[in-house]
Amino acid sequence: MPVTMETSKEHSKKRKRKHGGSGNAALTSANAAKSLVKTTLSSKGEASAEKQEMKKRKTEHPSLMEDRVSENVVDEPEEVVEEDSEASQPPVEQDDEQKSESEQQPELPSLNALSLPQTENEPQKFTELNLSEKTLKAIQEMGFETMTEIQRRGIPPLMAGRDVLGAAKTGSGKTLSFLIPAVEMLSALRFKPRNGTGVIVVSPTRELALQIFGVARELMAHHSQTYGIVIGGANRRAEAEKLTKGVNLLIATPGRLLDHLQNTDGFVFKNLKALVIDEADRILEVGFEDEMRQIVKILPSEDRQTMLFSATQTTKVEDLARISLRPGPLYINVDHRKEHSTVEGLEQGYVICDSDKRFLLLFSFLKRNLKKKIIVFFSSCNCVKYHAELLNYIDLPVLDLHGKQKQQKRTNTFFEFCNAKQGTLICTDVAARGLDIPAVDWIIQFDPPDDPRDYIHRVGRTARGANGKGRSLMFLQPSEVGFLKHLKDARVPVVEFEFPAKKIVNVQSQLEKLIGQNYYLNKSAKDGYRSYLQAYASHSLRSVFDVNKLDLVKVAKGFGFPTPPRVDISLGASMSRDKKQTSRRNYGSQPRHAPKFKRKTSDD
């Protein structure tokens, strides 16, 4: 039977007839697949015109939800409704006999029936993967030619439909290794907005989700499939509207994803073909274990491919892999044979410095490196807030990023620093995972990381890519040198850097005078001082980072106080490591409302 093009009027009549039917059934899987191919062929001309139009409209700055989602579905929003609606099926031609056959058949070809190109030998370049022309063109426009090890070993089995548990150090190219197979699968199955979501990527932080979204935007520049992002802090109603219209590739943070799965009626995810869990160890560390279990339980498991990536393999990651992956997954570890746990182009050092000299050294270092791109890590939001206010006040401009900021502020700061050629970003560990910030020269760990894994992820913000170069510097107090043994056990090579005393600018007296006279800086300094002690008291390596060994007079001088201010640190001292994790604080942020502790009395 020849394939004919439908006019919009004819298609509208068929659509009305389909919506007006009373319980008409779907096609069998064979007929559905056959009809889908016919429909795709018949609409080839229309799709081509749409793609040209979308190409013209492509914007440079990624928004929280790409405009393309609404452009692709503007003429057919009524076809994607609730999850069990008939209207979410592909628009295939049906006669009355076929309609009455079955109501439980899939609407898209299964992955088992799909034959994606495979390569027998391990490829070296993207052109050897037999990817679609659209994907190859996008990769070339992104400037990539040769694959990294995780891409060489991960992409072929993923394109063949295998479940994969991948372990690779930060900066190894994991994002493309799971996005390329996902995009190719959506393209091969000819996903359309009315089919709903075919791939979900779960990310631990909003910034990492935005970054993955940006890569997906570039990779799908020549594809007609839709993509979007749902994250905490964004407009939930706007997200729900876009999901109802149809988002084929969805990037999400766990809490917001679970919210939409449970409460957004028009969110069609029954056609899900692939689930990607990125930075799984961090997702579980910050208290999303229950959410991830619920997400995996809600999502359809039959005919679903799962890709789980984690820089470190923990017991919790193994448990998540057990419930989410199909039996017999492929395990890829590209780091186990490496001599060091950090990338080769990274020069790593530490400096031993007393508490009262730490800020002076940081100030001197930043002053001497104004032309460099630097990230400075702190242990708490209040420490970031205080140092940002102080440095900007004394004309040393910095950007700040932490979990207490509103999402729009965080997003703007992230992209501003990404686009900057030089400058300083001071932040909590919210920026320590997965973020690909271009051309970072120095990573400064002003406050100590919680463990060697956090150290590795912090320094992973520099020396990224195959031939990336960068430097890192960690501040240690004399009582903290025991941390070096933990780094050595984790295969992290560090050497001691020395800074001559004559090169350190002594601004201590001016600092104390400023903090004493400026009410707002004084209050901010006191909050930072308190939060620093709280974070130190709740450190996981208490044998090394013992709050009782701190010289509080010297610590106070580092915050601009001649004598230690009176602060209550009972919250930090009483907060166990497990409680800190399960509270889901945003990488250093303090709870909005501190718990009330019952005062002990003699009657107790």
Curated annotation (Swiss-Prot):
The Q motif is unique to and characteristic of the DEAD box family of RNA helicases and controls ATP binding and hydrolysis. PROSITE patterns: DEAD_ATP_HELICASE, HELICASE_ATP_BIND_1, HELICASE_CTER, Q_MOTIF. It is found in: Nucleus, Nucleolus. This is ATP-dependent RNA helicase HAS1. Keywords: ATP-binding, Helicase, Hydrolase, Nucleotide-binding, Nucleus, Ribosome biogenesis, RNA-binding, rRNA processing. Residues 155-331 form the Helicase ATP-binding domain. It holds the Pfam family CTE_SPB4. Residues 345-515 form the Helicase C-terminal domain. A motif (DEAD box) lies at residues 278-281. Residues 25-45, 112-121 have a biased composition (Polar residues). Residues 60-70 have a biased composition (Basic and acidic residues). CDD domains: DEADc_DDX18, SF2_C_DEAD. GO terms for biological process: rRNA processing.
